[in-house]
A protein has these predicted regions:
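Bacterial N-terminal signal peptides
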Residues: 7-17
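Positively charged n-region of N-terminal signal peptides that target proteins for export
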Residues: 1-4
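Short S/T/G/P-rich N-terminal loop/turn motif that feeds into the first structured element of a domain
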Residues: 20-239
Length: 239
């Protein structure tokens, strides 16, 4: 993940990844590389919190992160200061091992004063994903196991067609692992700017041909739990 192309949101990893081969939608989509650990927090000052982490990378170094970043919820927040810190790893093994190396609830007084931990969770990418954080639309979706592989296939198709149509977009589908009652499938549509995200929406409302693929994909979704825009960035890269 040095040149990270993850190809970076509940129970055991084996039980959650296996549905991709089930159902009557033949052919498994190759899962993406690596894994992510996300720490969901409520920050009194998100910008100050992010700067503090940039200036003090020791926690990232301690857990062996390959890359780390922050996402701040910009629209549809559940609470003021909603954001999360993510850490990218080369494998699920490394991601799981990181949980033994750092306890976010035992942080320094300086960190504890600026943010309140909500929960943490691991994610496995279910398709290739180019990690280029910026303007990100995040949907939390409930999708039955029998439809998950078909949904991922549609996202692979949609991403390809949208890029052919001139959009600089990365689409990711992520399986939560160990997220308790909080998490569902994460669908991310990432653009280099909010203006580009808006251009995609203009084309969608204008009847772009690729909207038929989107319609087929959303027909496989049981429930849209939430829909937000986030501003994401890389704040640490291992040397």
């Amino acid at each position: 993940m040095k040149n990270i192309v993850v190809g970076v949101l509940v129970g055991l990893a084996f039980g959650l990844s296996s549905p991709l081969v089930f159902g009557d939608h033949h052919g498994q989509v190759p899962a993406g590389d690596g894994a992510f650990v996300a720490l969901m927090v409520k920050a009194s000052d998100p910008d100050a919190y992010i700067q503090l982490l940039k200036d003090n990378p020791a926690p990232f170094e301690a857990i062996g992160s390959t890359v780390a970043g922050a996402c701040v919820t910009k629209t549809g927040a559940d609470y003021p200061g909603q954001m999360f810190i993510w850490n990218g790893f080369d494998s699920m093994e490394q991601a799981m091992a990181a949980t033994d190396k750092y306890d976010a609830n035992k942080a320094t007084a300086e960190l504890s004063a600026i943010r309140e931990v909500q929960y943490n969770v691991m994610f496995k990418p279910l398709k290739a994903f180019d990690l280029a954080p910026n303007s990100e639309r995040l949907w939390r979706l409930k999708i039955s196991p029998s439809n998950l592989n078909a949904f991922v296939k549609k996202m692979v198709q949609l991403e390809s067609v949208m890029r052919e149509d001139g959009h600089n977009v990365n689409i990711g589908v992520f399986q939560p692992i160990g997220g308790g009652i909080h998490e569902t499938i994460h669908l991310r549509a990432v653009s280099p700017t909010y203006a580009e995200s808006g251009k995609i929406l203009d084309d969608a409302f204008g009847g772009a041909e690729w909207m038929s693929i989107w319609a087929e994909a959303t027909a496989l979704v049981d429930e849209v739990v939430s829909d937000n825009f986030e501003q994401c960035q890389v704040i640490y890269t291992a040397e």
